[in-house]
């Protein structure tokens, strides 16, 4: 079988566990998408764009993880290759949107929003594209090379989100400044997991 993920080796119990988690993910993403679109009217106008983006992210993820599950079933039955690209196609769309959502929810001045969007969206796309060749390679040297290249825009994104946002704290209302401080720490904690998981076999 092509690729580095041979799902035909899964036991019946392992297959059921993966299927169950994917099913739970479908339900969660569908419910979240519906809720977010219906909740727009109850959100302040300046935050509605962030809500729409959030709903779009979960809708895109719902579609791609359904495709992952469909490929997973076909590959497990034998005769077809498990399509490893669906996750990266999903991330290529959703990660830039998540960054746009982060910028939108902070309610920064228009000039700041445009500047951050222009820098972060291309960097996030480069990070995903550069990471894919290493993800699908079983060779650790190849994985390390592409992982290193992907880390350049990854670190740039963290730099912009942490350092550049820090520069705006003094000019922001106290409630916005507090949100930015918490967000910086959350981003470091959550995004820091990705390089570790990328290098795992």
Task: State what each model feature region is.
Residues 28, 50-70, 192-199:
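Hydrophobic alpha-helical transmembrane segments of multi-pass membrane proteins
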């Amino acid at each position: 079988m092509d690729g580095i993920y041979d799902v035909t080796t899964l036991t019946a119990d392992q297959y059921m566990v993966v299927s169950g988690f994917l099913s739970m993910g479908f339900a969660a993403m569908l419910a979240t998408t519906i809720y977010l679109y219906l909740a727009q009217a109850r959100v302040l106008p300046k935050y509605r764009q962030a809500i729409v983006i959030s709903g779009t992210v979960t809708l895109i993820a719902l579609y791609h993880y359904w495709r992952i599950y469909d490929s997973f079933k076909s590959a497990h039955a034998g005769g077809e290759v498990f399509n490893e690209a669906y996750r990266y196609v999903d991330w290529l769309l959703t990660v830039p949107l998540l960054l746009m959502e982060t910028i939108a929810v902070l309610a920064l001045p228009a000039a700041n929003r445009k500047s951050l969007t222009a820098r972060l969206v291309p960097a996030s796309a480069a990070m995903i594209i550069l990471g894919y060749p290493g993800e699908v390679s079983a060779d650790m040297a190849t994985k390390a090379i592409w992982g290193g290249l992907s880390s350049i825009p990854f670190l740039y994104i963290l730099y912009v989100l942490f350092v550049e946002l820090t520069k705006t704290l003094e000019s922001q209302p106290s409630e916005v400044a507090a949100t930015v401080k918490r967000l910086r720490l959350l981003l470091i904690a959550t995004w820091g997991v990705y390089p570790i998981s990328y290098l795992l076999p």
